[in-house]
């Protein structure tokens, strides 16, 4: 606490961080914290009641946030021929085939999301050790392996994000910027929760949303009442 200024100490003292708040209250707490010189990202961390070691309880998918992410993405597309031209016309930042594969093998990963046409996946699959740990590998479930590269790029620009439960059963995602109106942030978070609930594996038993924390880049983590989220 000694690293925080007087204002943030006063704000944090007025809240009980041992309890869970409504989603709206949690967002309000974050927005009351002092601003910094950049527009902070609002992140959520969701512990799911799954056993990710079991193949029938792995969760991965995508959702279009209704109000976007507030982030300008660098989009890479693995494609050749007419599909490469289509991707360039649609506004992709990087487009290529074997040349991009070799560049990434060399350690270059200066992009935020990758899209690939199905015919490219044989070569792209060889990049698993580089792209996998960074959640950059294109997948059909996320809609990033597709022949319709124009649609994929447009959806990503509008706010489509991928979600995935890690080995601990935790899903982390950015859901907007702190400058967003409180209701816009709430709508984005509810859209993500709805997608996660729809993706619940039939084999998962017991409480599904175990814990839910919302935070900003430089702000505290606020626990949110999961009962509200399950009901929304």
From Swiss-Prot:
Assigned keywords, A-Z: Repressor, Ribonucleoprotein, Ribosomal protein, RNA-binding, rRNA-binding, Translation regulation, tRNA-binding
Domain of life: Bacteria
GO MF entries: rRNA binding; structural constituent of ribosome; tRNA binding
Keyword Repressor listed: yes
GO cellular component, one term: large ribosomal subunit
GO biological process, one term: translation
Pfam family, one: Ribosomal_L1
InterPro entries reported for this sequence: Ribosom_uL1_bac-type, Ribosomal_uL1, Ribosomal_uL1-like, Ribosomal_uL1/biogenesis, Ribosomal_uL1_3-a/b-sand, Ribosomal_uL1_CS
NCBIfam families for this protein: rplA_bact
Oligomeric and partner information: Part of the 50S ribosomal subunit.
Family annotation (PANTHER family): 54S RIBOSOMAL PROTEIN L1, MITOCHONDRIAL (PTHR36427), LARGE RIBOSOMAL SUBUNIT PROTEIN UL1M (PTHR36427:SF3)
Job of this protein: Binds directly to 23S rRNA. The L1 stalk is quite mobile in the ribosome, and is involved in E site tRNA release.
Stated family: Belongs to the universal ribosomal protein uL1 family.
Name of the protein: Large ribosomal subunit protein uL1
Species of the source: Chlamydia caviae (strain ATCC VR-813 / DSM 19441 / 03DC25 / GPIC) (Chlamydophila caviae)
Lineage summary: Bacteria, Pseudomonadati, Chlamydiota, Chlamydiia, Chlamydiales
Gene responsible for this protein: rplA
């Amino acid at each position: 606490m000694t690293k925080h200024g007087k204002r943030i100490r006063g704000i944090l003292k007025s809240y009980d961080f041992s309890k869970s708040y409504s989603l709206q209250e949690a967002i309000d707490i974050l927005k009351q914290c002092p601003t910094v010189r950049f527009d902070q990202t609002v992140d959520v961390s969701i512990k799911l009641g799954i056993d990710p070691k079991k193949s029938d309880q792995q969760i991965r998918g995508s959702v279009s946030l209704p109000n976007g992410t507030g982030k300008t993405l660098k989009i890479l597309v693995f494609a050749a021929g007419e599909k490469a031209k289509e991707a360039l016309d649609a506004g992709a930042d990087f487009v290529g085939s074997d040349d991009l594969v070799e560049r990434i093998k060399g350690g270059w990963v200066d992009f935020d999301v990758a899209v690939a046409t199905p015919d490219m996946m044989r070569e792209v699959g060889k990049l698993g050790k580089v792209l996998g740990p960074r959640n950059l590998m294109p997948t059909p479930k996320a809609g990033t392996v597709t022949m319709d590269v124009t649609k994929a790029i447009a959806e990503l620009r509008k706010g489509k994000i991928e979600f995935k439960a890690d080995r601990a059963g935790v899903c982390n995602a950015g859901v907007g910027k702190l400058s967003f109106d409180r209701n816009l942030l709430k709508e984005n978070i509810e859209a993500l929760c709805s997608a996660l609930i729809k993706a619940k594996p039939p084999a998962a038993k017991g409480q599904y949303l175990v814990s839910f924390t919302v935070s900003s880049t430089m702000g505290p983590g606020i626990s949110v009442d999961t009962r509200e989220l399950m009901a929304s």
